[in-house]
Amino acid sequence: MKIGILGGTFNPIHNAHLRIAEEVRDRFDLGRVMFVPAASPPHKPLAGELSFDVRYRMVQLAIADNPAFTISDVEGRRGGKSYSIDTLKGLHSAFPHDEFFFIVGSDSFLDIGSWREYAAIFNLCNIVVVERPGAAVAALDAALPVAIAHEFCYYEAEKRLAHRSGYSVYSIAGTLLDISSSDIRELARLGRSIRYLVPQSVEHYIKEQRIYNDAR
């Protein structure tokens, strides 16, 4: 089976996350997309120190009506910093016969050279780079760290980098929904509407649990 992997803090999960997952699922004919909430992101502090369990629950609610969407608590169970390489190695071992498509924003891909064991990631999965507002990738080959650029062949017409492992890096435009989790947190803190920014079930959960009311 072809499985998409979408990681993030999901603080909170919002409609742009869901739309990205759906467009990648449709574009690459994925059997399912697995959402992987980060326990402790290594590149930025978790705003408000919202617990893993609360963020996990919001993702559960958000994807409940889509049978192609699943969730994994692999990073919560592992503890420590949530490095992508560790997660991908774990999933590769757990599902050795499946093919993974790791979904990342263009802003993250442009910074991939700073990730732990970044070069090894290309040996474990395909990567789908989704353009984000303000972080366009003009050419995938130019975005690669110099140290590993020789491991790829670039097919401009397909917007695809073929890696020597047999996996590829793809670039897609997607629907640019400029929705920010930090903006949603601030709106919720102020008691303003977050309707249509998050799924209704997540909106109700945030209100009922008063998740962001204390400016966490």
UniProtKB/Swiss-Prot annotation:
Q: Which UniProt keywords apply?
A: ATP-binding, NAD, Nucleotide-binding, Nucleotidyltransferase, Pyridine nucleotide biosynthesis, Transferase
Q: What class of enzyme is it?
A: transferase
Q: Which GO terms describe its biological process?
A: NAD biosynthetic process
Please, which domain of life does this record's source organism belong to? Bacteria
Q: Which reaction does it catalyse?
A: nicotinate beta-D-ribonucleotide + ATP + H(+) = deamido-NAD(+) + diphosphate
Which pathway does it serve? Cofactor biosynthesis; NAD(+) biosynthesis; deamido-NAD(+) from nicotinate D-ribonucleotide: step 1/1
Recorded hits in InterPro entries, A to Z, give:
Cyt_trans-like, NadD/NMNAT, Rossmann-like_a/b/a_fold
UniProt-listed Enzyme Commission number(s)? 2.7.7.18
Q: Name one GO molecular function term.
A: ATP binding
Which HAMAP family would you find in this protein's record? NaMN_adenylyltr
Q: Which family does it belong to?
A: Belongs to the NadD family.
Purpose: Catalyzes the reversible adenylation of nicotinate mononucleotide (NaMN) to nicotinic acid adenine dinucleotide (NaAD).
Q: Which PANTHER family match?
A: NICOTINATE-NUCLEOTIDE ADENYLYLTRANSFERASE-RELATED (PTHR39321), PHOSPHOPANTETHEINE ADENYLYLTRANSFERASE (PTHR39321:SF3)
Name used for this protein in its record: Probable nicotinate-nucleotide adenylyltransferase
Q: Which organism is it from?
A: Geotalea uraniireducens (strain Rf4)
